[in-house]
UniProtKB/Swiss-Prot annotation:
It comes from Staphylococcus aureus (strain NCTC 8325 / PS 47). Sequence repeats lie at residues 75-78, 88-91, 98-101. Residues 1-26 form the signal peptide. GO terms for cellular component: extracellular region. Its main location: secreted. The keyword Iron-sulfur does not apply. The keyword Chloroplast does not apply. This is Staphylococcal secretory antigen SsaA. Not known; immunogenic protein. The gene is ssaA.
Amino acid sequence: MKKIVTATIATAGLATIAFAGHDAQAAEQNNNGYNSNDAQSYSYTYTIDAQGNYHYTWTGNWNPSQLTQNNTYYYNNYNTYSYNNASYNNYYNHSYQYNNYTNNSQTATNNYYTGGSGASYSTTSNNVHVTTTAAPSSNGRSISNGYASGSNLYTSGQCTYYVFDRVGGKIGSTWGNASNWANAAASSGYTVNNTPKVGAIMQTTQGYYGHVAYVEGVNSNGSVRVSEMNYGHGAGVVTSRTISANQAGSYNFIH
């Protein structure tokens, strides 16, 4: 059984999100919905407290009681089950991919996308500090002179979905998670470097699934104004911020 969950992490208070489904084909694709006639179909909701702890309520024909794991707590009719997972505090735009469940052995393997060169990170409270890593570079195509590639295949409400639309669809629609965008762009012929420019895509691999934003402006002091979706304010919420010149040079920019 293959399951992909797209979640937004709250840094304060509680966040509640509901999902239902059985299968998905790729990261950041929607699932097919809960089916009561499917022996492996299920749905669940979960809350995330201020410490980043996950609290799950399961409904349907499968739940984590079928697994032998520990650490994060799931609730099904007020029975507690354990799941061996890491704590994901202060990350945004995460698609948690739980793959390769086998009912016979009752085991599970978590496959995480990594991909992409770019800014590495460390965290202090809710602040992300990046350090420079060389960006891949390739020339031949550009966002400004490109053409629309087709439908937006990224998950609605995520940063990748917003940026694809913001650039008019003039990039690939199957670049995967944000962490992979720099490499995918370079492979497709776009220029990727550490120099911000209006209309470029800012990309980083910080967190497990990275983040992308659209460059709205570059100020005279080198600071960069970006707009973005699902960065600290929930899926589907577009916000803007200004990044210092020092930090800006640590991100990848796709042109």
